[in-house]
Design a protein with these regions (language model features):
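Noncatalytic, beta-rich nucleic-acid-contacting surfaces in large DNA/RNA-processing enzymes
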Residues: 1-224
Length: 224
């Protein structure tokens, strides 16, 4: 039950093999069934929007700088090493992270735990900018499907116009929501799927009349 756009971004980033293990905790923390906890209090600065759970590559970079004084270059190298599973590189950087964090007054055992958590999820971690783009598309399409369901389904059918199996599934889904899909009609149909004045979806003429587009234009020039 996302309540903010940030929740959509996190959902997109979490739904992959590594971070997926954290989904139950993320949900419970969001809905108040579990307390929001931070391994080190200052981590709230970058983990507040994700309820104390590291979700994005950018968070790993920012936290490595905050906790252990990594430079921008070192934090980016850490991101690359985790993303590409470069074990030798990670083993080389871990002591620097632990020691840098210790110098800043953080418990080495807690730092070990943080590093282990990062290793578990980071190989599949998504960067936030990509997750944001995908979530924006999801938000737009969800809005269209909720507010213009017939038009949305007609457009989706047109997008899958050469896949009859997918069109059949979409027709069934439309029917379940009260939207009927009707056969072609020379007075109502367009080239592809469309919606008539009654809110029904009409098959496009191009699916049934196996002629060139130019021939269809001569038959009904106003609709193509």
């Amino acid at each position: 039950e996302p309540s903010t756009f940030e929740d959509l971004i996190a959902m997109n980033a979490l739904y992959r093999p590594g971070p997926m293990d954290y989904i139950p905790d993320f949900i419970d923390r969001k809905h108040g069934r579990k307390p929001i906890e931070y391994d080190i209090p200052i981590m709230e600065k970058y983990l507040k929007d994700t309820y104390g759970i590291t979700v994005y590559q950018e968070q790993v970079m920012l936290l490595s700088r905050l906790l252990a004084d990594f430079t921008r270059g070192e934090s980016d190298a850490l991101r690359k090493a985790m993303g590409k599973k470069l074990r030798d590189k990670l083993d080389h950087m871990k002591p620097k992270f632990i020691e840098g964090g210790r110098k800043n007054g953080h418990d080495p055992k807690v730092l070990e735990k943080i590093w282990t958590d990062w290793e578990k999820f980071a190989s599949y971690a998504f960067n936030k900018s990509h997750a944001t783009c995908y979530s924006w598309v999801a938000y737009q399409t969800a809005f269209l499907k909720a507010n213009y369901p017939a038009e949305y389904m007609a457009a989706t059918m047109s997008r899958n116009i050469s896949n009859i199996t997918e069109i059949t599934k979409l027709m069934d889904e439309s029917k379940a929501t009260g939207i009927m899909t009707k056969g072609p009609d020379v007075n109502e149909s367009y080239l592809k799927f469309s919606v008539n004045r009654k809110g029904d979806i009409r098959f496009g003429l191009s699916l049934w009349i196996h002629k060139r587009r130019s021939d269809l234009l001569r038959c009904k020039p106003c609709c193509f």
